[in-house]
């Protein structure tokens, strides 16, 4: 499948989820707790936010994580392919004056700044070229910045939902760590959680 076809399939799927009112921000407490198997309190601790950082979330979705990050940072930028998803995220984050929500392709969007933190959860399994995605994240980090990833441990190669089928590209923790180093980052933390391995990597100050 061509990359542009994959992007269209992904966009259509997430637009359809919004039309079906499938929105993680609106999950009942039991399902919200289930999602934290990937990015709960240990993930937030690795971000190490004190209110002064600029932060980027590729694959921001409807803002499930962004709503936890925004009160803890100076400014949050989120980007997603799906127009309907971004519109929902804007609604959920409308109470915060320090957020920018963008609709576009993280890999090619012309960001005008670098960020003190970049983080992603349940995102990389949608991307075939992991090396390019991680290099892109590293390039968007300011010197001294930190990248935090939730590396999904599930190995499914397809997502079947509501009559739609999406290809997935499973993550591999060891390869992800190697690719972070290849992108010029220094791996600082590896934290196992229930459904993922959390990785944190820093960008050297002299980069």
Regions found by a protein language model. Name each.
Residues 1-50, 148-170:
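Conserved class I S-adenosyl-L-methionine
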Residues 58:
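Conserved beta-strand/loop positions that form the S-adenosyl-L-methionine
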Residues 62-108:
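Class I SAM-dependent methyltransferase SAM/SAH-binding core
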Residues 119:
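A conserved beta-strand element that flanks and buttresses the S-adenosyl-L-methionine
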Residues 122-123:
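Short catalytic micro-motifs in class I SAM-dependent methyltransferases
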Residues 131-143:
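A short glycine-rich, Lys/Arg-flanked "PGG" loop and its adjoining helix->strand segment in the class I
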Residues 168-184:
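Short alpha-helix
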């Amino acid at each position: 499948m061509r990359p542009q076809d994959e992007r269209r399939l992904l966009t259509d799927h997430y637009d359809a989820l919004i039309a079906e009112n499938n929105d993680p921000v609106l999950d009942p407490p039991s399902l919200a707790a289930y999602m934290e198997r990937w990015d709960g309190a240990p993930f937030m601790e690795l971000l190490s936010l004190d209110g002064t950082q600029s932060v980027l979330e590729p694959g921001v979705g409807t803002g499930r994580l962004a709503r936890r990050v925004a009160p803890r940072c100076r400014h949050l930028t989120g980007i997603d392919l799906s127009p309907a998803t971004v519109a929902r995220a804007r609604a959920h984050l409308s109470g915060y004056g320090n957020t920018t929500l963008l609709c576009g392709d993280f890999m090619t969007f012309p960001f005008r700044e670098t960020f003190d933190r970049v983080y992603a959860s349940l995102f990389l399994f949608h991307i075939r070229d992991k090396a390019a995605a991680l290099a892109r994240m590293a390039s968007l980090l300011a010197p001294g910045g930190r990248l935090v990833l939730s590396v999904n441990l599930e190995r499914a190669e397809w997502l079947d939902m509501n009559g739609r089928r999406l290809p997935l590209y499973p993550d591999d923790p060891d390869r992800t760590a190697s690719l972070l180093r290849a992108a010029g980052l220094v791996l600082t933390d590896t934290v196992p959680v229930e459904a993922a391995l959390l990785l944190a990597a820093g960008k050297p100050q002299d980069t």
